[in-house]
């Protein structure tokens, strides 16, 4: 039966319903967008947008715009409320600062509510906008938020305020790998583990379609179990469809940057994920060696080494690195076309370096790490460095005069992993009371759950800690067992070496005794010579005495004359000085008088100013009293306003309560209406059911009555049976009547309910009318109050205008007071300045007197020193002669040794001739053997023919296999198309619900086809397996044929055996001859080594003597210069020169400069720092001493020739970017010639000089392309040459270190000056020096620049070492970091 339409609906109701359905669908889509955390318009983004708009518009200048002011009035309060409800920095307690960078810092924090520990990263909005790059943090936030990888540090939430962005991340208490490498000597086993984890972490990032571009140990953090996670994704970039990246700037850390990324600067950068694998190679090298492979103190040095990596990559000899590790490093540090990992991670995973028994690529994260951090608590930060508090003022955005939009770039940054906003399902249409109860119950349950979860997590943590301790104890036990075994083996080795050493000791003692005899013999000779010298000296003295007796009288006369002259000269000088002092005294007295007069004038002015000041102060007091009265009036007015505002707020609250009551009434009304409609529906349903049942009963009754009548007519005889039937019918009728009664009672109940609902509706209508009346009354009251408020605001505006006028007057008066104060200060300053002038003049007078006395004393001391130095110089000359004679004797010995060597070589040649004869015999034997081999080759030909036949069979077999493979491929393609069709049909199913039956039939058909295809595929796979087994059988058959030996004729076998015997005999003879030869060679080699050692010792002694001579020469030069200065002073004093004529240059004469400077230790300032040396610059040499004692003993550390100096200059940040920023203004660089240091033991390993393919030659320069991220200027056009993120392409000369734009070279501009340094790299050196202050650095540079020869020194082809860079031989120390065997629980 068709149901009648509802009475209250319009004719077009179905169309409206359809429209509502479409609208609901769009609303759901919109809701999905708002709920989706990855959507740009999610709830957090919308709230951020509103918040940032209010922050950017809430300024006085912008509020003048009426629209902006209205917007702020509307949303300002609600935005403040949102800020109060949202997460903020105050929700966390800061434990410690664990990191600081250019944009902010990382803090270790504890959440106040949950008591959980996190790492919170703060990024300054001002710094990011100031440096014109605010996009890098988006990639970092998105990766950490949506990665869901165990290899990436997780982001729990991100929020912001007006100053900072906050990222709350998981805390990694193990610190970074830089900390681990600084505390431990990393063995290869550990390096294998950490490299494998880095590879897996990078693979996870690459699988997201990103390239990291800044892989380094600083960005590798360790969790509490010691496993690795990657961090700092600010440099990440999205790959295109081909897996490549387009970038015009070189991004990354200089030591870890790849060549292709370096080449991208200023050009079309196009590279792939292989740039990350380069960084992995650098990281592995650093772990095993202790330094990066392309380390240099300057940026240009590192970049040039990276570009020339084929020549510059070398492994140090003092560190043991396995062949597999070297191969892997070389495979990573190659050109990108051949680099390992270019074709996928599986390439790297299959490397032999990673093979081990402890872990594999699938379970590495479940295995125990090499170092598990020992933590005292959940806030243990011992693996992080202590960072000083930043006491500097935090910079903020200035107040704008127009709209700037500083907050707009950060809209959408807010994120929560567990987003509670809009997380619940839409609210059910039930009573509010039930919902509140349910929510309260759910909150209580959640609290209990949370407490249980916390308890569980603590228990789990405790369990994990115990398991870790057990694991660590097991690993320690294993380590100790291994160490024990190693110690046993080491002990055995030591014992064997001890025996060898004892034998060598006995030999050395024997040699020592022989050398002692020789030394005694030499000593006797020396004593005899000394006796002869003494006798000669006695004779000389006798002769001198005779001569002196005749000359004494003349000398006395001369001495008296000299004394008279000296006394006269002294008298003259004293009279001159007395005259000078009188003049200066008169001048000073005049100056004092002038100053006194000036002082009086100033005092008078001061008195006048004080009177003016008093007047102004009185006026100021009067104004202040007026101001206070105004303030009182204002406060009274503000109190009235506050009262009115309170009344308004009360009325507004009443309004709100009225609105809420209205809303509740409307809600109840709706609910009742809904109930009414439901009841009506039920009633109509019930009526329909009842009518239907009645009709059915009536029909059954009519049928039964008809049957009854027929039965009465037919069967009158069987009354008894009929009576029983009637009884049954009557019972059925009774049951039916009961049912009818029940239905009627139900109907009455429904009607009663309807009446009650109608009564309630009428009551609610009455209530509604009453509330509307109340609302109207309240609105009228509100209008009256608004008029009062307007009147009061007008009054307030008038008062503010009056106040502004008063304030302007006050400002004028305060300005006048300030000007008077300023003039008073100036007068006081002038007075102080004049007083200081007076004091200085008095001091100068006293100093002049002291200088005169000191000069007299120095004259006497220098005379004594001169006499002593003359005596020493004669002694040194005699010593030099003796040394020269000894040197000549040693050269003779060397010649004799060379002759012996030639004799040995002649003997060796004769032995070689004998060897050739034996070899000819062997050749004749080989001829006979070749005949036998020819016969053997005939047999092999037959064998090859058979092999060819087998190959043809194999080729046919392969063809058949390829055909079958093609059919399988075609089937697989059909299978793919079928699966794609299934996916398409599934999508259509969702869109077209009406055609569901048709699509299901098609799907079932497709599934049948798919099953049949799978069956066909299975058949073909079986065929493939059978083909493979046949193939393996064929290969095995081939191997049998190949390995089968062919029968050889018996007649030729005996000849071969005979010849083999003869061959063996010859081999034995050859062996014996070779052994004899090697023994002789060893013997002669030992003698040669001993000779070379002696020569080296002698040359070292000669160098040291030469260095002492140089230092003595410089001392003599100093004394001569001092003498000359004294003579000049004497002459000038006799002539009567003024006191201000001769000006000393910093306390040193023009030719000499000395002081303390620092040199870099092992050319690595980052690791080993600087060492202090006392440096003296004479007219010819630069002498370096370890201490002043060495200087007194004439024992220099290093000597350089000034003639060979090329260039001296102060360094920039790019030259020594590893040095501390405070040290850079104190460092300068010396470039000098170095024509042969081969005979000297090198203190540092010499860096190999690579090809100059990457240099750009221009005007004598050797330019290297670079980028500057630090402040630097172009030395050609003086424009900025740097940028923090996108620097312009630049060039730097590797010789003179001039810096310029690359555009000058490209445009062929003539701005660039020629190179100041012309030298061959193989015969040149540079030296960095650190002065005590910037003033000293400037002094050293200016003085050394003057000493550089105008023409560059020509390299001497015959010179052995000019200049000498003679350094004392120091013990070879390892470059590795100091080892650490203790657990990693250390103070950072």
From Swiss-Prot:
Any one GO biological process: positive regulation of gene expression
InterPro entries associated with the record: AGC-kinase_C, C1-like_sf, HR1_rho-bd, Kinase-like_dom_sf, PE/DAG-bd, PH-like_dom_sf, PH_domain, Prot_kinase_dom
Domain REM-1, residue spans: 497-573
Region (Disordered): 1-24, 513-532, 1345-1388
The EC number(s) this enzyme carries: 2.7.11.1
Polar residues: bias regions: 1362-1376
List of residues binding ATP: 98-106, 121
Coiled-coil portions: 439-1024, 1052-1131
Residues annotated as site: Cleavage: 1131-1132
GO molecular function, one term: kinase activity
Region (RHOA binding): 979-1047
Domain AGC-kinase C-terminal intervals: 357-425
RhoBD domain mapped to chain residues: 979-1047
Membrane topology, as annotated: Peripheral membrane protein
A Pfam entry, by short name: PH_MRCK
Composition-biased stretches (Basic and acidic residues): 513-530
Region of interest: Interaction with NPM1: 373-420
Top EC class of this enzyme: transferase
Protein name as catalogued: Rho-associated protein kinase 2
